[in-house]
Amino acid sequence: MKKRSAALAVVIVLMSHHIAAADLPVHEVQVLAGKFAFDPPTIQVMTGEPVRLVIRSKDTVHGFSIPKLKIEVRIPKGGDPVIAEFVAPSPGRFEIACSEFCGSGHGQMKAALISVAPVTTNR
C-alpha cells in the first residue's frame, strides 16, 4: 500500500507540474542548423516554462539532440521545420549536439541550452 501511495504522490506532483506549465505562455525559439553550427549557439529558457524549438537546416540533414532532456529530432535538408517541445525540469546547462553525421566538422557541432530558475520576489 505504501508503494502505491508513493507512486500516486509522484504522479500527482508530475501532473500538477505539467498543468502549471500548460498555464504559462510558450517560449518559442527559432534554431538554424548548418555549416557545423547551431544558431543561436546558446538558448536560454526559464525552468518550468513550456519551450517550443522550431529547428531548420540550411544545408544538409542534421540531428538535434539534448541527451539529458531526452530530446532527439532529425532535421531534414531543405528548410522544412521540425518542432521540439519540452519543459526544462531544473536549472542548469544542457549540451546540444548534432546527432546525424553531417561532414568533417560534425563533432564540433554543439550548442548549449541554459535553464535558469524563475526569479521570485518576497513581498
Briefly describe each language-model feature range.
Residues 6-17:
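Bacterial N-terminal signal peptides
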Residues 41-43, 70-75, 85:
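Beta-strand-rich interaction surfaces with strong enrichment in secreted/lumenal proteins
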Residues 96-100:
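Short, aromatic- and glycine-rich surface loops/edge beta-strands on solvent-exposed regions
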Residues 20-32, 52, 82, 87-89, ...:
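Extracytoplasmic/periplasmic copper-protein system
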Residues 30-58:
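N-terminal targeting signals for Sec/Tat export/insertion, comprising classic cleavable signal peptides
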Residues 48-49, 88-94:
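Short tyrosine-centred short linear motifs in exposed loops/low-complexity segments
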